[in-house]
């Protein structure tokens, strides 16, 4: 049996302020830092040993991962940072307050943007793209103007196939510290959740979710720590 642990980053300033974040690189709050320490302590109590940790290129996930690795005394582990594990890109909604958008566009429309598998949020214009050097080296197509959860799912899965799954098949436990929507996409895949069923899945900040996997990487058990 191999273990896959998924953890959403601790509370960010955008979580605290109730704004859409996406690829905006916001820091953790003091609460988020405490959540990361607590997640690490809960993981330490399990005694799990990991082969590698995977995270995004956004600081809220990277800092959470490093705090957790310190708590479990495994800071020496290989740490793989990839844009493919970035949060879903919320397009022109980024930085906007969620309550304000509900008032402006209506609750039903906002719910579709946030939770639907296929609905794409309002897009950034080409002029509004950041052209961040973290992404430009991969080509213009990498930095999206906005994404549905399906689009995020499609960019995550190649990383799962090429980097995470082979290590699990080799018997190495893996730790993934990422974001709410991207972890929902991975959970959809692992648990075979339908396109409509995924809208009800929530991932809390700083709560380790451990999947027990058989030799074919089928889920045979699940725990939250």
Swiss-Prot record:
UniProt-annotated binding residues for substrate: 8-15, 21-22, 60, 87-90, 98, 114-115
Q: Which reaction does it catalyse?
A: (2R)-2-phosphoglycerate = (2R)-3-phosphoglycerate
In what pathway does it function?
Carbohydrate degradation; glycolysis; pyruvate from D-glyceraldehyde 3-phosphate: step 3/5
The active site lies at: 9 (tele-phosphohistidine intermediate), 87 (proton donor/acceptor)
Biological process GO terms, please? gluconeogenesis; glycolytic process
Enzyme Commission number(s) from the entry? 5.4.2.11
Asked if the record carries the keyword Magnesium, the reply is no
Q: What is this enzyme's class at the first EC digit?
A: isomerase
Q: What UniProt keywords are attached to this protein's entry?
A: Gluconeogenesis, Glycolysis, Isomerase
What GO molecular function annotations does the UniProt record carry, in alphabetical order?
Answer: phosphoglycerate mutase activity
Q: Where is the site described as Transition state stabilizer found in this chain?
A: 179
Q: Which NCBIfam families match?
A: pgm_1
Similarity comment text for this entry? Belongs to the phosphoglycerate mutase family. BPG-dependent PGAM subfamily.
Entry-linked HAMAP family: PGAM_GpmA
User: What does the function comment of this entry state?
Assistant: Catalyzes the interconversion of 2-phosphoglycerate and 3-phosphoglycerate.
List the protein's name: 2,3-bisphosphoglycerate-dependent phosphoglycerate mutase 1
